[in-house]
Design a protein with these regions (language model features):
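N-terminal loops that bind phosphate or other acidic moieties
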Residues: 1-203
């Protein structure tokens, strides 16, 4: 089995595991400021990707990332599906076009695409409040452990933010004091990816 096959299959399993373990928590966060189904939706998307992992692992890495993104768009639903899907599809396309050496450039372009898709920016209590800090860490080529830590810290910081996008924005000031569920799921996935990559590199 090629290294990228192992990588794709391993990352899919790691992401599925962490979302399954925290799905109820994510839905609990979402009940406070949204529809209450974020954990259920994320788990459905991750299970769909996991079910098709053998097909994805046979693809070149960039293509696999793009195809996984498409699967998430079709299966997660709600606002999160298009955002996570856009992120991965853009990363995959940019890696395919520019080569896999510069992941930071691909990530930067993909995060901007997510911002455009969601019509959001940093500080508005969305998953972008994790994606932008993670992007900063990747650009600076910080260690994987530092990237994971920054993601977790950034998700926590959304507790003090007022929601300006999505259903949570209808709550106005009452959205303050609650962690954004999209930011939390993004931090969880970032942490799972970083920990897997760290272990994979050491193997």
């Amino acid at each position: 089995m090629r290294d990228d096959q192992v990588l794709v299959s391993g990352l899919i399993a790691a992401c599925r595991e962490i979302i399954a373990a925290h799905a109820d928590h994510l839905s609990e966060l979402d009940r406070a400021i949204g529809d209450g189904d974020h954990g259920t939706n994320m788990r459905r998307g991750c299970e769909a990707v996991y079910a098709d992992r053998d097909r994805f692992s046979q693809m070149p890495l960039a293509q696999a990332i793009e195809e996984i993104g498409l699967t998430l768009v079709l299966t997660i639903g709600g606002a999160s599906g298009p955002l996570y899907g856009t992120l991965l599809m853009e990363i995959g396309r940019r890696l395919a076009a520019g080569g896999e050496a510069d992941f930071s450039a691909a990530l930067t372009g993909a995060v901007e695409a997510v911002a455009r898709r969601g019509r959001a920016q940093r500080g508005e209590k969305t998953l972008l409040d994790v994606l932008y800090p993670v992007q900063d860490e990747v650009i600076r080529r910080h260690a994987l452990s530092a990237i994971a830590e920054r993601a977790e810290t950034s998700a926590t910081l959304t507790v003090g933010m007022k929601a300006l996008r999505g259903r949570a924005s209808f709550l106005g000031e009452r959205s303050i004091g609650h962690m954004d569920p999209g930011a939390r799921s993004c931090a969880l996935l970032t942490s799972a990816i970083c920990h897997y990559l760290k272990e994979h590199r050491a193997a």
